[in-house]
Amino acid sequence: MNAVVSTITQLLPAEIITTDPEQITLYSQDVFTVGPPICAVVRPRNIDEVQALVRACLERGTPIVTRGGGMSYTSGYIASAPDSVLIDMASMDAIVEVNLEDRYVTVEAGCSWQKLYEHLAPLGVRTAYWGTLSGRYATVGGGLSQNSIFWGSGQSGTAADNVLSVSVVTGKGDLLETGSAAQQRAAPFTRHFGPDLTGVFLGDCGALGIKVRATLPLVPLAGAKGYSSFAFGESGPMLRAMAQISRESLTTECFGFDPYLQHQRMKRASLAADAQQLTGVLQNESGIVNKIKQGAKIALSGRRFMDDVEWAMFTISEGRTEAEADHQAKRIRDICSSEGGKELPDSIPRILAANPFGPVNNMVGAEGERWLPVHGLVPHSRGEAVLAEVEAVYE
């Protein structure tokens, strides 16, 4: 038996440690990369077990990597050397505290974005940034380690922009608190208590410490939502419209499909999936008349309206009132019209908003191809040029 495995087996309960060959193979890779084989997977249930594990690995000189939901493709939890120990945070998924008065929530790092959102929604709040499309599996800790982006990003930015404090187990096994939580008897209500140590542990893929808890700010759920879809003949006008919409903070989510992606997605989607998603839309609407109206609109529009669309843009807006949402929608229409956009049925953003954490099926194409997302963050002024350079690679 590997020396470090022997040590941790004596320190920790056997049921949280596995050296099963199939599990070792699975956990030695992410969605994209197969790394060197690890020697063990450990699923700690509390902070004490994380600390004991780290100290044992430090004593043996064994590297550690930390895994959240396993949805990434950046080699963030791939070992750099064989016989490393992988910490799977899946068992540490508790929602520790919801403080509605001071507007924060503290969760364990293995909590999924979906679990957190569904726990908070009945209370009338959500986190400012509230996860990725893969959020039924992707975790809060993983999102902070990768600095993920999507739900809420149109107004609130990335995951790392929306953290008040983190609890981190250091490479020596000590527990470090950041933000105001670092002060004894103080609540974790603000990030800035002395130097911004919180930021050190965000976007690090777990390399600088093991995040075991995080405290995130809460915002009210929207009183009203608006949805829009537009078709563009070229990418340039669409990107200019998206940039202006973002500069004016008109949406919480604004995203687009290139011609290849949207044709593939329309080909793969099934009528059964459409029916399930329509059910989600109806549950998301208020009032029986509005449920019937929106259900009929989506059913009648189907997917045919996308047949001749080259570049498509979709927005989801949030307002405190219907009047505010309507005002945002009008401004979005004006911006898109000025760039030559043609308005489409709003069924795609409406369905997505009603089913924010759908099946994670974008790793395989409609005909069995292997798909891998490629991401980047650029300023608005560089958007058109960067897309042109990317497209040139494939021409």
Q: Where does each model-flagged region fall?
A:
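Short cationic amphipathic helices and targeting signals
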Residues: C39-P44, V105-T106, G226-A231, E310-R320, ...
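N-terminal flexible segment immediately upstream of the FAD-binding catalytic core
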Residues: M1-R55, M71-R103, A269, S301, ...
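FAD-binding subdomain of flavoenzyme oxidoreductases
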Residues: A94-V98, E108-A109, W113-G256
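Flexible loop/turn segments at secondary-structure boundaries
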Residues: T25-L26, S72-S75, W113-K115, L218-P220, ...
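C-terminal substrate-recognition/cap domain of FAD-linked oxidoreductases
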Residues: P21, L239-E395
